[in-house]
Amino acid sequence: MRMRSLSAASSGYNGDPRGLGLERLKTVVRGKLRPSGSEIEWLWPSDQNNTASPAGAKTDQPTSAPRFFLTREATVFGPSWKPASRQIVASVLPVTGEMVMVSAERFSCMALFAVFLKLYRGFYMKPVAPCATHVRRPIMLAQFPVFDSRPSHGPQEQSGSHEPLARAAAQRRTKHNFLFMPGFPCLACVPISASAERHDRAMAACRAASLTEHLWPAYGIRALHMLNRTPAAASITRAVARRSRLLTADLTRSLETFPAGTITCAAGAPMIFSDCRLARLDFSAFYPCLYAAYVGKHRGLTKILHERLRRRAGSEDLKPALVTMFGGLRHVDANGYRFVVGASNIIAKAVEQTANRMGFGVAAYVKDGFWGAFDSSSKTTAEELRAECEKAANATLARLVVDKDGAGEPPVSLVLRLEGVYTDGLLINANKYWLFNSESGDSFICGVMGGHERSGLSRETTAAADDILKKIKASAKSIDDVEAIARSRIDAWIYAIFGHRGDVEFWAEQTPGDKDFLIPEEIRTTTVGKLEAADSCLGGELSYVFIPKNTQDTGAAKTKGGGARGWHSAPAAAFPCSLVEDVFCIKINYEAHLLPRLEGLLAWSRIYAWLQFRNQIPLADDEDESTTQAKETARIDYNYGDVSFLFA
């Protein structure tokens, strides 16, 4: 991982946290930093007289602090952006603590930074005694974005009729906050909601930090790999030889068909399922378990996987670490990544064959999970299906990794979970479907635009799509009924999100990486300079909101047609939220966020309506089915112009 200077010293940065964002922005503008390149940023501290000083300045050894100790001195050479020099460095570490618990309702990342700054000044900016032992003043280092200071609300604080969705979203928002700097205590800051989680949440965070040995998330994709203690040289040789044997010809061939994992969809999609037995199943920590089987003895990873698979209290905190490990596996262990994906393909084939023998047809298989329907004559229960498919998966994995002499048994067994049983469904493609249990009211929807994001807008949109499909199933008798249902629910969706105007957190989306970033003229100052060149550096990593490019004309212009597609907002650009929270106040281009989601809601409604009622509509002699479908479902529309004034 590369490191770049934030050039705070050269600009006279005096350690005031309120200027941190501006100094970072200046460095991005000058082209000295690319946040999307996984770089670590270095801040040169200043002395108490506001005069910037290099990292080579000497200070006294902090012997007066009983709760901290000074590490042994080390010699390093650097930095990389100027002529290298030899430097002696040391760090202060806490004696009794490694985590900080803070109030989720009142936590501020700037307050945490101020605490670290006070520690830093106390240890390293004291006057130098004439006979004191000197050490080099350490640099300050931070990786951005570091903080997620949004509160994690408990389930009882959520309102509305979609409590499971709201509760899941609230759980995803709970996150660790790290500010790690040489010379600072490297503390994990865990937000605790006193009203909802209390002691259990704190203990879960401590348990997760202990299992990862405080390496996550500070070391990102390499954190869990670092838990693997280096064996003796002879053991390394044997391990390399064993792993090379695991990349068999069959496994390699499977990568030619599915290089990123098995993704299949039933022929004939889109289609609907009515009054039948459906089941959705998913492997827990699937890819990390396969990697554990590949590497063999990896006690740190094995311990974490056992904790996660047993669903112990607080194990949810380990999921981001496991997901990140596999997300970057191709960059850390390319052969291990090839084995994991190839093994998952072979296991998927074995699982589907087992399911077919039990009278279960797979509608969609996506990497580590699948769903489908039982034959009407099948007597197999969903639990029996789960158990047999899990057994087949473990037997297949054992054949892939166990040697002829019986060595190499997987350290953890694969666990297949039954996520839900349903009676009705809509399949559009492998990544876009809806499942519903008419008896219990449970549902699951996948593929709604932004449905995987944490923002309030995405949660509201997912709930709206789910509601529309449920109401169509329950009461629609014709396409005209679908039109009325969609219009009514979209009205409710519009007015629900109306109350969140100006809330950057509610509207934030994940950065697409290839959007047109253009920061408006009103925040281009002589201090910051022109920002166009820096826009692309902010793509791909951060969350963003859309803003108008032309701030003089932010209204929408109506064109012929009048529907959702008949409105064109002023040109919009994505703007990184990290620059909004503490530095700028901007005007959000609401239409740029709303219109794609509105089209998505209409598309779900149109597809379901056509599949449900197409047998009632005769085809004209001069039309094919697609033409008739487009004509008949066009009436399911929504004129955004009628409500655009709400977001003007």
From Swiss-Prot:
GO terms for cellular component: host cell nucleus. It is found in: Host nucleus. Residues 43-63 are annotated as: Disordered. Keywords: DNA replication, Host nucleus. GO terms for biological process: DNA replication; viral genome replication. HAMAP family: HSV_HEPA. Belongs to the herpesviridae HEPA family. This is DNA helicase/primase complex-associated protein. The gene is UL8.
